[in-house]
Amino acid sequence: MSTPSAAPALLEVDDLTVRFGGLTAIEALSFRVHEKQIAALIGPNGAGKTTAFNAISRLVKPASGRIRMRGVDLLQRRASQISALGLTRTFQNLALWPGLTVLENVMVGAHHRGHQGFASATVRWGTAREERALREESFELLSRFGIADVAFQPCEGLPYGTLKRVELARALAGRPQLLMLDEPAAGLNHGEVVKLGELIMLVRQTTDVSVLLIEHHMRLVMSISDWVIALASGRKLVEGSPAEVQKDARLIEAYLGGADSHAAS
């Protein structure tokens, strides 16, 4: 079995347990995400992947365990403070503002770096100098992702694959240290999935951002990930390099043997 990256750990999850009433959704989960690493959480439906994401981003309260980012205890912080610590998360469903232009949506993504709150950021950006800097930086992100041609169009009515790229650009506009992507390939066709993989690799190659993703598209996961953590029924089955994990008998059994009956997702 391969050893994890020698780079420092950015995110440390230790003995994480999450319960909903009498149901244990995650039990004693531990893993690391290292600097400039692409890590993936995989597993059948009900494995606990999204619950783990929700715990890390402080949307659900764990029963026990510890979550640290660069040594900072995230469980001692409110959900509203998480982005300022360098953690940005996308969701399975798009969360763009349809009435704003593509460029404005990306500019909103950088709101926590300034002095404006999220709501006010959609109305006024601060000083003219701040707005100009945000606009230039956001347009550069759109250019990098190949969608600068729609920068001044409203998001409403744009193709779904384009909106996925807008969402990724907006997440990066906040200059995160850790980017958490929740099923980024959902709803994309084959060509769009290939492009998405190229964009995620581009992020790793051109920035210091680490990526943690949940994804069911195994070809994408195995082609871009440095490290894979496989879950089933709220527990960690195996972790390792993509080559090691995809041939592990425990993971094969989890997908084919009905280990997706657990209620977490």
Outline where the language-model segments fall.
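Glycine-rich phosphate-binding loops of nucleotide-dependent enzymes
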Residues: S2-S265
